[in-house]
Amino acid sequence: MASLPSYQDAVSPDWLPLVAPYVSPKDYPALCGVNRRYWDVFAPRIWSRIPRSDTVTGLDDAEYDLDWLLNSVFNGVSRMRSETLSLVRVFDARSIRGTYSLSMGVNLNTKLKNAVKFLPNLNCVLIDGHEDLDPSESFAEVGHQIQLLSMAGCPVSLSIKFINTLRGIVYLDLSYASGSLRPLFQDDVLPELRVLKIQGKEVDDTTVENLTARFGTRLWSLDLINNKLTDQALDSIGAHCLWPANLRSDTNFDVEGKLEFGCTTPDFGTWTRIVESEWSASFSHPNRHFVDAPLYDLHDTLPQECVSKRLDGKFPVKSDAADAVCRGLQGEDPYFPPASFQASQGLTHLNVSGNRVSSLGVMKLLTLCRGRLEQFSCDSMMLVPPLKGTMAAVWWPKAAKLYGFYATHTLRPVLSSNLRVVKLHHSVVTQIPTLELEGFSSMACLHIAENILLPRAEMAFPEPFVPDMNPRITSLTLTHIPRRSSGPLINRLVSFLKLLSAQERALFDLSSRRGPSVLAGLRHFRLEFEQDAYEGDAYIAGEIDAEELLNSGDKGFSFFDDEAGGRPRPVRELATSPPQKRDLTEFSVSQGEQDLETEHLDIDVWVDGKSTTVKVWVGSASNESSNPMLRDYRELALHCKVHDRIGPASPAQIRAGVPSSALVFHTAWCMAIMPCRHKSATIKEPTRVELDAMKDVLSELKQFRLEGRAKYLKLQGQSANGTCPPGPPHGFWLGKLEVSTHQGTLRSKTADYWR
């Protein structure tokens, strides 16, 4: 048995590994020749990944091609020392051009196959976008040792035989690759799979049902971007992939509130109501920014790692990106050991952007996820499921689509206990929905959404997301943000940045004195903008560079400067569809109910496996003259019989006027954001003058940041020690703010871009 190290050896780490990260990679080859100790430190940095980055090889990315890789690197594999070959763990061909010379003679995949069999420890393969590489052929003999395979965009499919050899694979990315997913449905296939990415694979609800039933809680990350999923798929994910143990508790009742559970219905799930404490509804408890204290077992019967408890919020979220998982499997992650990437306690990372889900489906999933999700992405969702074939469709404006997410209470830690990284439609913060109306321009839709729908959305859901609603969230991405605004959108985003600055100051004050550990707060805020909606000269809009616009100190560019003096457009009204003849009898019967002074409807629902009658709140008849949103909700419930998604009132709905203990029709409530049949609420197209007044959101945000930074630097210069605390009075947020625009290609702006 080896002797234990001395105390001095144990507390005095070798200095060489400590300084290695700061050494220039171009010096690695020379340092390997110093002695064996240096070789042990620097040789893995050269050979762990093939091809190595240009910082080691001295080659530019443009010089990488498959000819170079196979002829200069793999040709000499058979003559290299086995000790050196054993260092190779990653084959990353993503930066290499996907073409090769016909003069190579030997088939590309055959040559690669002959080379990789000399690499006993190769376990990560990344070949995204390559047309010439077929993993089923190239890596047939080493499939059993592969733990990560990323082949997004490859026009080849994996053979069933090869998939059966991937017994130890942890990460698999088949996004936009050719071939069916049917091989994944075999019994006892991919037993160690933990991360599955299948973007753009035409996946439907049935496929997700089969997939989730097959893998269950084995997956901790599932990426389903750009498929054909509806709310039914979210139900399948919630039923099969989430670990059964509940992370929610009443321990933090004073700070966060607590949950009260009721019956279970098929379309809404378990009725879950938030019971507020004296502080929780205002998100103002003095202890809201502290990390969780350690949880001790009263009887000391379980090891601490086996106790089911939420994360304390102190450490970052484990990433499911290919590079991050690759580093983690090699033991290079500073926070998570390789075992954490290979183990699973159910789904924690879910991405369903680019699908056909609704906000109600997302609300149900987040409500019933037992606090397990740590990272959730859904860039756009319909406000309600499709209305075709229902009486409600008669009252919804013809050919209208509404997108948004208002269930902000589901992001609170009392429900989403572990949620740290979020990507959602911008309405979660701005309360402004995305509107699509047939016959109306994009600019007109933006104006209508801000000036007609926003006031109604504020009536329905008077509780937008704010940073202290969940200070455990560290990263927030808002999507589908319009480039043009008549004012409300700009004001909402600016107000949110001010709240971020205020949170930053509160955390700074707490961390500057002795006390419990403090949460990081929201440190990464990303804004994803849509393409500019200007339609008068589309070719001009396509040439506008957002970076140049934001970096300039000039007034924001106006697309309408040449037309400001033009005559207003004739006003058009969007009429609602007249009732069809077959519906008149039903409407007249419902009108009789509406004339009653009832505030509740008796509805038969299927609860816990049996039919039960419940009372659902429909509003008071006295609200018809004072609150148009409540008036339309009542009409949708009584007149149109929109009686689905029955559930407890959310905190926002209670603030809007719903009794705290009431049940509501959630679909009807969301639909009431859109004006119904009332003549006074007819949607009119804005005039050219009104559209001319809309400002560029990017330009206004840039101006706000420049003014805040100027104040910050001035206060910093006036300080005796040259420092300035965050927050008021300058209000300049010091976190990482990113912007992306969809103009030609997606361009991302770094944090320095805003400073």
Predicted segment positions?
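A structural signal for leucine-rich repeat
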Residues: 113-117, 137-145, 160-169, 183-192, ...
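Acidic, serine/threonine- and proline-enriched intrinsically disordered linkers and terminal tails
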Residues: 236-343, 380-399, 429, 435-455
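Extended, C-terminal alpha-helical/coiled-coil scaffolding tails that mediate protein-protein interactions
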Residues: 15-18, 111, 524-529, 533-755
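Conserved hydrophobic beta-strand positions in leucine-rich repeat
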Residues: 91, 125, 147-151, 170-174, ...
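Short, solvent-exposed loop/turn at the beta-strand->alpha-helix junction
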Residues: 97-108, 129-136, 153-160, 176-183, ...
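Extended, low-complexity alpha-biased scaffolding regions
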Residues: 41, 49, 53, 57-77, ...
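Extended HEAT/HEAT-like alpha-solenoid repeat tracts in very large eukaryotic scaffold/adaptor proteins
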Residues: 87, 339-354, 411-418, 465-478, ...
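N-terminal adaptor-interaction module of cullin-RING ubiquitin ligase components
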Residues: 1-107, 133-141, 159-163, 184-185, ...
